[in-house]
């Protein structure tokens, strides 16, 4: 299915009278949360909008027209401007960031680096200052999360500047099937995510050929890879109509893929990520020219990964001491690899689970609680 990608014009919202009050409540609460958080900030990031949801205020009366975008930690100047223009979008930027963070932690739950977050607005700590393949994945999955959240918010009528998808009818859709319904607006989600997420990188100016300029190019590439993964995995969904489920007629629409599928695809890209360097013209090129050049959907990195085996404040590595491991596994979650050869401790723990469940007419399921003593293994 062919999908078109356009360019967002922030001026679309200038003529709007204002966004919904609920979005203002969200922004005010978020600003209050960060203003009282006493933390050491190493490097602000918009990812912080996905951390620690502020207290929901059901009835707040705000005097004044503008939300407190300028007080939100983690936003660049360009992102703050977009915040002012699109007040009702910010809640879904936060939801997208949260979705990306959770997916990162799921995908790396059995790895030495498990996408741990820290208690400040850098979210992932100093480890993101290294242009590693882990950083590449994090940028990609976070950008993907924003596309996902924005596209769905449009479909659900939560935003003032978009609605259901207007994607063209696929050419391979049978003629007697209707193209309609209310699909996820992936075009809009893609465009706004690109405008917002890339704003910080595009504002940064560094000398041509510098390490900082290489990081900007790396970040922009991986942001795009995340967005395109969501875009390309979207597919047609259909609903049958007809007497007694005969499905004599179908209505179809464009639908986002489950985000786990996006995470799985990006994890595969992480495993095959391309090592890059800056050439004399200030462009990223592959370190090993024998391989095919990475596409816009591949992940790229410029630094080797730090040693995640031991705690290191300078690199942000938390180490693997105290991590649970699987004694019988030969994979990355196995005690030999997870514990980096340091060995492991064994202890017993009591687990309680539902068991012996029975269906009773009508209509409920009744279960017993079973306890079991199990062995667990923890890295030294």
Curated annotation (Swiss-Prot):
GO biological process: anterior/posterior axis specification, embryo; atrial septum development; axon extension involved in axon guidance; axon guidance; BMP signaling pathway; canonical Wnt signaling pathway; cartilage development; cell fate commitment
Pro-peptide region(s): 36-61
List of glycosylated residues: 114, 120, 312, 326
CDD domains per UniProt: Wnt_Wnt5a
Disulfide bonds: 104-115, 154-162, 164-182, 238-252, 240-247, 309-340, 325-335, 339-379, 355-370, 357-367, 362-363
Subcellular location, record wording: Secreted, Extracellular space, Extracellular matrix; Secreted
Lipidation (O-palmitoleoyl serine): 244
SMART domains in alphabetical order: WNT1 (SM00097)
Source species, domain of life: Eukaryota
Tissue-wise expression: Expression is increased in differentiated thyroid carcinomas compared to normal thyroid tissue and anaplastic thyroid tumors where expression is low or undetectable. Expression is found in thyrocytes but not in stromal cells (at protein level). Detected in neonate heart and lung.
Pfam families listed in its UniProt record: wnt
Signal sequence segment: 1-35
Any GO molecular function: protein domain specific binding
GO CC terms in record: cell surface; clathrin-coated endocytic vesicle membrane; endocytic vesicle membrane; endoplasmic reticulum lumen; extracellular exosome; extracellular matrix; extracellular region; extracellular space
Family to which the UniProt record says this protein belongs: Belongs to the Wnt family.
Disease: Robinow syndrome, autosomal dominant 1: A disease characterized by short-limb dwarfism, costovertebral segmentation defects and abnormalities of the head, face and external genitalia. The clinical signs are generally milder in dominant cases.
Subunit structure: Forms a soluble 1:1 complex with AFM; this prevents oligomerization and is required for prolonged biological activity. The complex with AFM may represent the physiological form in body fluids. Homooligomer; disulfide-linked, leading to inactivation (in vitro). Interacts with PORCN. Interacts with WLS. Interacts with glypican GCP3. Interacts with PKD1 (via extracellular domain). Interacts with TMEM67.
Functional summary from the UniProt entry: Ligand for members of the frizzled family of seven transmembrane receptors. Can activate or inhibit canonical Wnt signaling, depending on receptor context. In the presence of FZD4, activates beta-catenin signaling. In the presence of ROR2, inhibits the canonical Wnt pathway by promoting beta-catenin degradation through a GSK3-independent pathway which involves down-regulation of beta-catenin-induced reporter gene expression. Suppression of the canonical pathway allows chondrogenesis to occur and inhibits tumor formation. Stimulates cell migration.
Name of this protein: Protein Wnt-5a
